[in-house]
Amino acid sequence: DMQVTGGCGSTEAMMSTMLATLDPGDEVVMFEPFYENYGPDAILSGAVPRYVTLHEPDWTVDPDALAAAFNDRTRAIIINTPNNPTGKVFTRAELTTIAELCRRWDVLAITDEIYEHIIYDGCRHVPLAAIDGMADRTVTLNSLSKTYSVTGWRVGWAISPPGLTGAIRKVHDFLTVGAAAPLQEAGAVALSFPETYYAELAAGYQRRRDMLLALLEPRGFGCFPPRG
């Protein structure tokens, strides 16, 4: 009750979190390419996006470029893993580097983990909040949309340090009041699904990924096999 705020999808949870934690002129670090809402959400909150490029072919992070994006005005960093649109899954080593920078500069991490169960090739999802020293400076966003194939339901949540929960809920209340109560009840049931559900979900998506790669690559398309 002190950490979880339900909202109208992770999209609204992201907006509520930014409005609750950012002041005009603050800077927000985000990796590009990125899901289309992150930059505009920061701008609507009065903040300034600072972009760090993920490099092809496997969308690696340049640690020097990442470190150079942090300064005294940096208030937050957004991490989306598995990443939309690249399919990159951030490694524990990459997340540890991000965590070290967050601690050094006293920066809040906002993580969008909506694809956490859709991972391929033996990759593992590592929540940034599980990295040492990050539980108290991470807001984790998620939703029912992708894991349970109900994107139209618009049920999501933010898991925040207790000290931030009140501010996020206040903004959420004035944005949308709340997600549909019957759909929240259904979501609570879905969250108790057995582990076999998630394994079958990921396996099904991986089969479709492999099918598309097998069609595209022989025809001359350069493809990065998404990890998630």
Residue ranges and their predicted role:
Residues 21, 28, 41-42, 102:
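Short hydrophobic alpha-helical segments of the AMP-binding
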